[in-house]
Amino acid sequence: MDPNILWQARNDGSALQEEDIQQLRSSIRGTVVLKNEASEEEYNAAVTRWNNVSIRLATLVVYVEDEQDIVKCVEFVNKHYLDVAVCSHGRHSYHGASSSTGMVIDLGRMRRVSVDKEAMTVTAQGGCIARDVELPLEAEGLATVFGAVNETGIGGLTLGGGVGFLTGAHGLAADNLVSARMVLANGQVVTASDDENSDLFWAIRGAGPNFGIVTEFKYRVHKQGPVFWQMLFYSPDKLKDCVSIVNQMHNISLAQKGGDFQVMMAYLTPPGYPDLHPGLRIFYNGPEEKAKELAAPAYALGPLSVSGGMCNFSDTTRIPPYLEFEGFDRYAASSAHLDYPLDENLLLEVFTMFRNVIHKYGHHLLHPSKCILDLRNYEKVASVPIDATAYSGRFDVAWMIPDLQWDDPAMDSTMRMEVTSITAHIRERVREAKGGHVNGPRDATAIYPNISAGGEEKAKSVFGPNLPRLQVLKRKYDPDFIWNKWFPIVPA
């Protein structure tokens, strides 16, 4: 089936009549913001995203109040054959995740959370951001797995896999999902779990945006106390020294059974400095003394500055001060995997490429533009069979993530090209190292979907060997290809 035929058949709703809009409004409790009717301020607020590159001028945005509102919206989409996108919170580098020129169903008003300490679960509505769930859990001495930033919507994060600093201990956010209540493409409301609609439950844990709108997530939770959290920045001349210890740091992480010690490397310009500096982010789910013992190689390099210490877990998912800037809210990010042991020469090549981009475009790029080397322990993720859920990236690999941030719309395509050229170089070098192929089910082009631009042509890189089964399930649950954003799966 040609996805372009299905996409082109859907319309932007510009031909909707006033009576159509009134019918929608009268059928829901929520609010309809109409492009040609709302004030400029109201409309801009409805379509603005964390990444301004992602803004699409939707004909109508519906702020739903409850599950029944979502059902009515889906029925309206089907009746008028509209293009549609779903916005949990809109914090993604790719526009297709939550923007549409037709209808946007915005879940932002659905943020109720309920903690069941006896059952060790938490239930959260689909419009929650991670902080909405983290804080009430923390008050009970509990936590579940979300991402690195607590302003991220739990919907897209969970349905695409979801990795964070507790992933080493507890797996993906999707691995901690107990059940999900969903509105399907035909407007039907179902529960997906191991016991109900188990094929759908398999699919949404890694490919969820392709199968419906989750109105309610239920997660397993875990006991959680204070953690150790520090950011170490080094002088620019220490880049090679930092790279020289990354394999050692990863091996130390692997040696700590339980996944409690996690490390990430960053290459960015800290506030008050004129150029890029290497940095290491240290996380340990335990006491400071043990953390510093494990991270001894990082401290031995002589950091220029050290910030952080023992803190609540929720403090680790706040955006750090050195990344908080007003404006410069246009982003491009991509990802590519690297196998252990990491090739230090390749890492230096990549960091040099990134530095050249920063120097080339100078004033266009904000200081928080960064290149991240994710060294976190993915053994727990890799211990789950690749076909156990739709999420196929079940390997203990490192991820390189170039992330550019700018403010001039004229630079959008250039910045996207620069980011993808870096990850394309990595993938080519990975292929060369493996003689043009890889062993097993992982392709050298594999990407992490929650930090990459979407597109149907990349579905194979995201879903790997699980794609054929997903295409069959897509035909069952969304034969008309309503959910065609993010990394769309074409029905078999």
Swiss-Prot record:
Q: Which cofactor does it need?
A: FAD
UniProt xrefs under Pfam families: FAD_binding_4 (PF01565)
Q: Which domain of life is it from?
A: Eukaryota
Key words of the record: FAD, Flavoprotein, Oxidoreductase
GO MF term list: FAD binding; oxidoreductase activity
Annotated pathway, please? Answer: Pigment biosynthesis; Secondary metabolite biosynthesis
EC?
Answer: 1.1.1.-
- Species this chain originates from: Aspergillus terreus
Q: Its induction, per UniProt?
A: Expression is significantly up-regulated at the end of late growth phase, in the presence of Butyrolactone I. Expression is positively regulated by the pgm cluster-specific transcription factor pgmR.
Q: What name has this protein been given in UniProt?
A: FAD-linked oxidoreductase pgmH
